[in-house]
């Protein structure tokens, strides 16, 4: 592995860790409503967005074709679920 490849891999890993921490911060800042269903949807939406963000980092920095394929599948599935949460939350206002 060249130094450049190692740096690229580290950048991807560090970006992923920062994304996880940002997502955790976002989840911690969500004010709980006391409505379990609404709180579940809000928290899961952030959680799913983290999965999308991490998958995009895998596509940008990863090397494994298998992991890149999985990342693409995760992005598609999680975006659909985020849209479902958005639709449900929109009806709760």
Segments (PLM) and residue ranges:
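His/Met- and acidic-residue-enriched segments that coordinate or traffic transition-metal cofactors
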Residues: 1-93
